[in-house]
């Protein structure tokens, strides 16, 4: 039997996902896949990092990051800081889940439980810039700026369209290189 830590971002994109998470935890317990579950909730940025930064090898058999790419990024940074090398599973519930999507990770209850039961891990490359680790992509400029400008309430109402709306708002502020030269 395995021990799991679920790091859950309640402010993540699909905000009505707690029943889904409860169902997955129930499935894992009832099928004898895990016998201990701890849940760490995030309240603000970097909470997921803090929740995983002091973990020790063997403390958990795996961690489940429940959220979007930002939650996954914070968990990865915490696990690396801890040196625990605990395997990470991702349950996509955020607006942006490009890493989980690229790996075609399941998000439905039965498929997710089967993935955990099979416990086949995949090694991924980890990058580092300015002391920050990443497993997905590194970005800068307007794309990064938009993800920070879009507030949680707008994202909850509009979903991914919130990023588009923020992009429209910044158009008057962004001039092309051609315009700057002339």
Residue positions per predicted region:
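Glycine-rich beta-strand-to-loop/alpha-helix junction loops that act as flexible
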Residues: 10, 66-68, 91-93
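ATP/NTP phosphate-donor binding region
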Residues: 1-63
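Short amphipathic alpha-helical segments
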Residues: 18-20, 76-79, 101-103
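Short, glycine/acidic-enriched loop or turn micro-motifs at the edges of active sites
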Residues: 12, 72, 95
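Catalytic core of DAGKc-family lipid kinases
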Residues: 31, 42, 81-182
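Short Gly/Thr/Asp-enriched flexible loops that form oxyanion-binding sites at enzyme active sites
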Residues: 71-83
């Amino acid at each position: 039997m395995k021990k799991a830590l679920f790091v859950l971002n309640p402010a993540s994109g699909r905000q009505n996902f707690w029943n889904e998470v409860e169902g997955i935890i129930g499935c894992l317990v009832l099928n004898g896949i895990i016998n201990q579950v701890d849940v760490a909730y995030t309240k603000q940025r970097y909470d997921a990092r803090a929740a995983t930064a002091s973990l020790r090898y063997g403390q958990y058999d795996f961690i489940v990051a429940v959220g979007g790419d930002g939650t996954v990024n914070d968990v990865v940074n915490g696990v690396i800081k801890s040196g625990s090398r605990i395997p990470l599973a991702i349950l996509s519930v955020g607006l942006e889940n490009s890493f989980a999507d690229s790996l075609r990770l399941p998000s439905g209850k039965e498929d997710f439980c089967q993935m955990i039961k099979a416990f086949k891990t995949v090694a991924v490359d980890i990058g580092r810039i300015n002391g920050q680790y990443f497993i997905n992509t590194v970005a800068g400029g307007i794309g990064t700026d938009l993800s920070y400008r879009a507030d949680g309430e707008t994202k909850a109402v509009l979903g991914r369209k919130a990023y588009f709306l923020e992009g429209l708002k910044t158009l008057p502020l962004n001039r092309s290189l051609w315009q700057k030269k002339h």
